[in-house]
Amino acid sequence: MDVRQSIHGAHAKTLDTQGLRNEFLVEKVFVADEYTMVYSHIDRIIVGGIMPITKTVSVGGEVGKQLGVSYFLERRELGVINIGGAGTITVDGQCYEIGHRDALYVGKGAKEVVFASIDTATPAKFYYNCAPAHTTYPTKKVTPDEVSPVTLGDNLTSNRRTINKYFVPDVLETCQLSMGLTELAPGNLWNTMPCHTHERRMEVYFYFNMDDDACVFHMMGQPQETRHIVMHNEQAVISPSWSIHSGVGTKAYTFIWGMVGENQVFNDMDHVAVKDLR
């Protein structure tokens, strides 16, 4: 488990390139036949990836001491979106087939969660967010047909994109976790511009669907003290509540967003005009 401390905005603005990457970038999300796990003290979110190829993968009691529990989801809820080939997630003996861009919400209290790929030639890539939970909501599969798509932006401003809301109150109940997938239209490069912060929630972005020769300049920092982190395919970045979170790519890309915090009101944002950015 890679543990990241909370950080004040006044401290963050003093960091150099490597300092910013050390604090906020999750450089390696998928490792064959293993799970990766980054624990952030910012709202205590856990993010990572699971890519089973030759064997099943599960999170065992080895994390219990670090989390102060007997098993991973004793006091947590889990959201998973599969960006790879078809796979299965077995929750306490109940098997769910999770295809490409299918998702699974797993409620607090699930003791055994086992991940597997159906075809080792095209393994599943399960990206997950995990947050503290106060009660148990039912485990539920969500398919792309069930999400709430919203198309925003314009080709003229290079920010036309479709936001697919997987785990939001209109689709299913969770304690605090919200997740979704945003896909830029071909030829569009910007996400979340004009940008915003939200003091009541933190957020994690996971960028993917990027060619090897492409990158995204992820914009972060306080609106009057902006910085950037260069992101490559299948990397994630932590965004504190005081930070903007936007990006511009060398080509179109897709990203998964996950939020935890005070509420689940998607439009509860503190908007920042482009003219006010520094």
UniProtKB/Swiss-Prot annotation:
Cofactors: Zn(2+)
Catalytic function, reaction form:
5-dehydro-4-deoxy-D-glucuronate = 3-deoxy-D-glycero-2,5-hexodiulosonate
- Residues bound to Zn(2+): 196, 198, 203, 245
Q: Name one GO molecular function term.
A: zinc ion binding
GO aspect biological process, one term:
pectin catabolic process
What does the record give as its pathway? Glycan metabolism; pectin degradation; 2-dehydro-3-deoxy-D-gluconate from pectin: step 4/5
Q: Which PANTHER family match?
A: 4-DEOXY-L-THREO-5-HEXOSULOSE-URONATE KETOL-ISOMERASE
Q: Which family is it part of?
A: Belongs to the KduI family.
Function, in words: Catalyzes the isomerization of 5-dehydro-4-deoxy-D-glucuronate to 3-deoxy-D-glycero-2,5-hexodiulosonate.
Q: This chain belongs to which protein, by name? A: 4-deoxy-L-threo-5-hexosulose-uronate ketol-isomerase
Origin organism is: Shigella flexneri serotype 5b (strain 8401)
- Phylogenetic placement of the source organism: Bacteria, Pseudomonadati, Pseudomonadota, Gammaproteobacteria, Enterobacterales
The gene coding this protein: kduI
